[in-house]
Amino acid sequence: MKVAVIGAAGGIGQALALLLKNGLPAGSDLALYDIAPVTPGVAADLSHIPTPVSIKGYGGVDPTPALEGADVVLISAGVARKPGMDRSDLFNVNAGIIKSLAEKIAVVCPKACVGIITNPVNTTVAIAADVLKKAGVYDKRRLFGITTLDIIRSETFVAELKGKTPSDIQVPVIGGHSGVTILPLLSQVEGVEFSDEEIKALTPRIQNAGTEVVEAKAGGGSATLSMGQAAYRFGLSLVRALQGEQGIVECAYVEGDGKHARFFAQPVLLGKDGVEEVIDYGKLSTFEQEALNNMLDTLTSDITLGEEFAAK
């Protein structure tokens, strides 16, 4: 099993690479790529950690050696948010990066499962999908927007609020991966009851948690370490499912049945081909249904922006 981390010299990429070096199944190959020349050094550094995972790093303009033979590609390449920016402000730079990487993936490893971390995810996933489609290699089961950060934040904040162990809390999060499009289904958290006031306070806190970190870092970056952990959780789940483990469910932003929008985040059952089944998210509370209805215009316009960029 070969996993490639693209954007591996950045804050998210380095954190993700460290976790994968420690946590991938024995015998896995880990390839790191970044345009930054430091990348082989990041791999050399990580190679000293005594785990049965081989690691190589590649810098420069061509990601081909990292992508060759990859089963899973995790993309965190791009610029990070700074104070005063929202995820859509990243579009102008990051859209071009995702487009060129998707063009390369289409040629080098068209069968790989691709997880996109690069923001704005609502838009970058649509770009990747249409670039792969144009190349005739798109398989919607193998392309994911990684929204796991919204899930781990939800689990953490709920556990803190209710005095529970975070690992005992499961919060499905649907919609997209920015602002109002992030919808935690707090009504579905087992063993926990929320007042209306708690839901009205917790929902925007989860939606705006990224901004909380950007502001706390005071211009020094965005959520890199927690995002690295989130991408690791999703990436490892995907690897385990590809290797035949049954019953692995994660929320992810995928192309489903188009009921709400072409791409939508919801629970998915992972399998040997990527998405085995998109799972119905169940009954929503009145608050959640209203929030869903109110986000769809934003989500749809985010997706359209990506489709239009890919068509250029």
From Swiss-Prot:
Enzyme class, first EC level, given as a word: oxidoreductase
Record's keyword terms, sorted: NAD, Oxidoreductase, Tricarboxylic acid cycle
Example of a GO cellular component annotation carried by this entry: cytoplasm
InterPro entries in alphabetical order: L-lactate/malate_DH (IPR001557), Lactate/malate_DH_C (IPR022383), Lactate/malate_DH_N (IPR001236), Lactate_DH/Glyco_Ohase_4_C (IPR015955), Malate_DH_AS (IPR001252), Malate_DH_type1 (IPR010097), Malate_DH_type1_bac (IPR023958), NAD(P)-bd_dom_sf (IPR036291)
SUPFAM superfamilies: LDH C-terminal domain-like, NAD(P)-binding Rossmann-fold domains
Catalytic reaction annotation: (S)-malate + NAD(+) = oxaloacetate + NADH + H(+)
UniProt KW Metal-binding keyword: no
GO biological process: malate metabolic process; tricarboxylic acid cycle
Active site: 177 (proton acceptor)
Binding-site positions, NAD(+): 7-13, 34, 94, 117-119, 227
EC number, UniProt record: 1.1.1.37
Stored Pfam families: Ldh_1_C, Ldh_1_N
Keyword Oxidoreductase applies: yes
Subunit annotation: Homodimer.
Sequence similarity: Belongs to the LDH/MDH superfamily. MDH type 1 family.
Function as written in the Swiss-Prot or TrEMBL entry: Catalyzes the reversible oxidation of malate to oxaloacetate.
HAMAP family: Malate_dehydrog_1
Protein name in the entry: Malate dehydrogenase
Gene name as annotated: mdh
